[in-house]
């Protein structure tokens, strides 16, 4: 391992689901809009404004191209959390006097679940569908859940914790046949897997800049124009972004999102091959060195930049402390301050004990083969050490069912 350290910079970043480093090409494109090209894109009476507006519209076209949309269907927001809130609350407010039922999954991102809980207090009925043990939606369950009161189905493209890819085309087909709007939080899939809003019959889609090597604080929302989808805005003001999201647009951030989208679109195949190769290398080497390691979520129907692994017989928190040279997560960054086991892992039927042992490893554009090999060796040596110290691991090896043990207080 000492030999490996010579050309490595520690700690190694492996938390690509929580955020990504900004691509140098993105930063280079943004810089002029912080300095000389500082105009307000809404100022129509001089060249500074025209220049900024032109940059914003170019970025809008780049974002639209990635998902096969029209640029007029893209509005800029501060990120996917705002986009999700605008969809769920905005659509319920606009159509709520006609339909009062929304369907989502128990494994959605916290911002979707909490927006839905907010609506429940306002009289909207929410159905939280269970998922199968591989993390994928059961389409028959979805069909049976839709009623004549159903307004919206909200299902994310790629799960942020376990990386599974939901069958968007099939979901979209069901929604279109039943005359229900289909929203997808595509933040973890945008620019990483092919998503075409027309082929998938997606009516609304949430996008984040910092998940695709772009800047933080910028995102987008795709809103279908034909057939037209309406939302009531969350923010009132000057009526920017087709009246749906008022406020002066942050030109440098939008330029960054546009360039990041263009790079992701042009290099998707290359990035996918790179990530898939490193995923297989990491997983195969881990399995060859230590036992009782479980991949959470479907192995094939997933974005392979996400490796969520459970290591039986040890605590996730102790693993993170032991492998401090790796920047990893024990769950969604939005909830990792909590010592509760991941609600996503619990929703796929994983026991509380095993859920507590899970670590999410993220692989991305800038991850190297050398980093993967170092990570594998570090993880395996530390897991082996922690297991040798663990009485629980010893009991498991002796065939003791930990669930049946009755612990007594002293």
Curated annotation (Swiss-Prot):
One term under GO cellular component: L-cysteine desulfurase complex
Q: Which cofactor does it need?
A: pyridoxal 5'-phosphate
Residue numbers carrying N6-(pyridoxal phosphate)lysine: 211
Looking at the Swiss-Prot or TrEMBL record, what is one Pfam family this protein matches?
Answer: Aminotran_5
Domain of life, per the record? Bacteria
**Pathway membership, UniProt:** Cofactor biosynthesis; iron-sulfur cluster biosynthesis
Q: Which reaction does it catalyse?
A: (sulfur carrier)-H + L-cysteine = (sulfur carrier)-SH + L-alanine
Q: Give the EC number(s) listed in the UniProt record.
A: 2.8.1.7
Q: Where does pyridoxal 5'-phosphate bind?
A: 80-81, 160, 188, 208-210, 248
Q: Which residues bind [2Fe-2S] cluster?
A: 334
* Keywords for this protein: 2Fe-2S, Cytoplasm, Iron, Iron-sulfur, Metal-binding, Pyridoxal phosphate, Transferase
* Active site annotation, chain numbering: 334
Alphabetically, which GO biological process terms does the record hold?
A: [2Fe-2S] cluster assembly
What top-level class of enzyme does the UniProt entry assign? transferase
Listed InterPro entries: Aminotrans_V_dom, Aminotrans_V_PyrdxlP_BS, Cys_deSase_IscS, Cysteine_dSase, PyrdxlP-dep_Trfase, PyrdxlP-dep_Trfase_major, PyrdxlP-dep_Trfase_small
Q: Where in the cell is it found?
A: Cytoplasm
Q: Which GO terms describe its molecular function?
A: 2 iron, 2 sulfur cluster binding; cysteine desulfurase activity; metal ion binding; pyridoxal phosphate binding
State the family it belongs to. Belongs to the class-V pyridoxal-phosphate-dependent aminotransferase family. NifS/IscS subfamily.
Describe its assembly: Homodimer. Forms a heterotetramer with IscU, interacts with other sulfur acceptors.
Name of the molecule in the record = Cysteine desulfurase IscS
């Amino acid at each position: 391992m000492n030999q490996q350290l010579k050309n490595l910079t520690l700690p190694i970043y492996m938390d690509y689901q929580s955020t990504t480093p900004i691509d140098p090409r993105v930063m280079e494109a943004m810089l002029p809009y912080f300095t000389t090209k500082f105009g307000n894109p809404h100022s129509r009476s001089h060249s500074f404004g025209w220049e900024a507006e032109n940059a914003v519209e170019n970025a809008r076209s780049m974002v639209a191209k990635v998902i096969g949309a029209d640029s007029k269907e893209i509005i800029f927001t501060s990120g996917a959390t705002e986009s999700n809130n605008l969809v769920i609350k905005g659509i319920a407010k606009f159509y709520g006097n006609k339909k009062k039922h929304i369907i989502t999954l128990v494994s959605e991102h916290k911002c979707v679940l909490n927006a839905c809980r907010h609506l429940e207090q306002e009289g909207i009925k929410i159905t939280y569908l269970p998922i199968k043990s591989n993390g994928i939606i059961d389409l028959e369950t979805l069909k049976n859940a839709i009623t004549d009161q159903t307004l919206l189905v909200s299902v994310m493209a790629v799960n942020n914790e376990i990386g599974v890819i939901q069958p968007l085309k099939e979901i979209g087909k069901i929604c279109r046949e039943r005359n229900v709007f289909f929203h997808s939080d595509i933040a973890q899939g945008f620019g990483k897997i092919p998503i075409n809003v027309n082929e998938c019959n997606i009516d609304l889609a949430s996008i984040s800049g910092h998940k695709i090597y772009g800047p933080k604080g910028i995102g987008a929302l795709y809103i279908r124009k034909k057939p037209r989808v309406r939302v009531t805005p969350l923010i009132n003001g000057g009526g920017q972004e087709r009246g749906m999201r008022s406020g002066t647009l942050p030109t440098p951030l939008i330029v960054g999102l546009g360039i990041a989208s263009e790079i992701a679109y042009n290099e998707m195949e290359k990035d996918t091959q790179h990530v898939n190769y490193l995923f297989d290398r990491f997983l195969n080497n881990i399995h060859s060195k230590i036992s009782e390691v479980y991949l959470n979520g479907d192995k094939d129907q997933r974005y392979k930049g996400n490796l969520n692994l459970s290591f039986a017989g040890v605590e996730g928190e102790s693993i993170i402390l032991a492998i401090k040279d790796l920047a990893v997560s024990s769950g969604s960054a939005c909830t990792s301050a909590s010592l509760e086991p991941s609600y996503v892992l619990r929703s796929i039927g994983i026991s509380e004990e095993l859920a507590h042992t899970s670590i999410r490893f993220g692989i991305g554009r800038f991850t190297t083969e050398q980093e993967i090999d170092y990570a594998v060796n570090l993880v395996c040596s530390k897991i082996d050490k922690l297991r040798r110290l663990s009485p629980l691991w010893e009991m498991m090896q002796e065939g003791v069912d930990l669930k049946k043990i009755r612990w007594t207080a002293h």
